[in-house]
């Protein structure tokens, strides 16, 4: 492989030298009389060409010594490996993302179900509390009405008793004022005769 590259490089250098020599030969044929120093120019050109060929040969040797192709191959291999790792990491990340997205969707669904259950239970609890409050209010109202009715009955009984007491007192006062001693004896006698007749 190295020998083939060296032969190729040497062939390129020889072709460049040949083309340069051909160019100078043509120029010398066309206007050789005008240039007295064409031999000196040719010698200068040859040294420059040799310098260039040596420079190319040294560059090729240095590149081979540095193993640029191997370095580039290693670099390419490293880049391919890194790229494969990046692709694998991307696929793993996409898989994880899909998994987490699925979990998040599932969690959202569960949250919605829990929220709906809590809302439904809250509504049922609200209805139960309202029903209990209505029952308690009805019981309190019934108790209040019963207490009020009892109080009214008690008040009526007390009023009747008081009215009867007052009526007796008033009647007694009127009787005491209006009845004379003879009337009293007459009434007692009538009462006694009624009692005797009944028995």
Curated annotation (Swiss-Prot):
Q: Which GO terms describe its cellular component?
A: plasma membrane; proton-transporting ATP synthase complex
* An annotated Gene Ontology molecular function: proton-transporting ATP synthase activity, rotational mechanism
**Which key words tag this protein in UniProt?**
ATP synthesis, Cell inner membrane, Cell membrane, CF(0), Hydrogen ion transport, Ion transport, Membrane, Transmembrane, Transmembrane helix, Transport
Kindly report the protein's main subcellular placement as a broad class: membrane
Cross-referenced Pfam families: ATP-synt_B (PF00430)
In the bilayer, the protein is annotated as: Single-pass membrane protein
TM ranges: 5-25
**Localization, UniProt:** Cell inner membrane
Query: Got any disulfides in this one, which pairs?
Result: none
How does the record describe its quaternary structure? F-type ATPases have 2 components, F(1) - the catalytic core - and F(0) - the membrane proton channel. F(1) has five subunits: alpha(3), beta(3), gamma(1), delta(1), epsilon(1). F(0) has three main subunits: a(1), b(2) and c(10-14). The alpha and beta chains form an alternating ring which encloses part of the gamma chain. F(1) is attached to F(0) by a central stalk formed by the gamma and epsilon chains, while a peripheral stalk is formed by the delta and b chains.
Q: What does this protein do?
A: F(1)F(0) ATP synthase produces ATP from ADP in the presence of a proton or sodium gradient. F-type ATPases consist of two structural domains, F(1) containing the extramembraneous catalytic core and F(0) containing the membrane proton channel, linked together by a central stalk and a peripheral stalk. During catalysis, ATP synthesis in the catalytic domain of F(1) is coupled via a rotary mechanism of the central stalk subunits to proton translocation. Component of the F(0) channel, it forms part of the peripheral stalk, linking F(1) to F(0).
Q: Which family does it belong to?
A: Belongs to the ATPase B chain family.
Recorded protein name is ATP synthase subunit b
Please name the source species: Citrifermentans bemidjiense (strain ATCC BAA-1014 / DSM 16622 / JCM 12645 / Bem) (Geobacter bemidjiensis)
The gene name reads: atpF
């Amino acid at each position: 492989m190295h020998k083939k590259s060296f032969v190729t490089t040497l062939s390129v250098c020889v072709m460049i030298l040949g083309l340069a020599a051909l160019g100078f030969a043509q120029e010398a044929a066309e206007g050789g009389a005008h240039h007295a120093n064409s031999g000196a120019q040719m010698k200068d050109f040859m040294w420059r060409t040799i310098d260039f060929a040596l420079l190319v040969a040294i560059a090729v040797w240095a590149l081979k010594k540095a193993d640029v192709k191997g370095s580039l191959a290693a670099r390419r291999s490293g880049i391919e490996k890194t790229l494969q790792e990046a692709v694998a990491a991307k696929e793993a990340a996409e898989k994880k993302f899909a998994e987490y997205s699925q979990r998040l969707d599932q969690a959202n669904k569960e949250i919605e179900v829990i929220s709906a259950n809590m809302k439904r239970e809250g509504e049922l609890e609200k209805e139960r509390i309202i029903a209990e409050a209505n029952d308690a209010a009805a019981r309190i109202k019934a108790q209040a009405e019963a207490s009020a009715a009892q109080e009214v009955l008690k008040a009526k009984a007390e009023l009747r008793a008081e009215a009867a007491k007052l009526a007796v007192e008033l009647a007694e006062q009127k009787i005491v004022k209006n009845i004379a001693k003879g009337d009293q004896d007459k009434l007692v006698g009538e009462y006694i005769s009624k009692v005797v007749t009944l028995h």
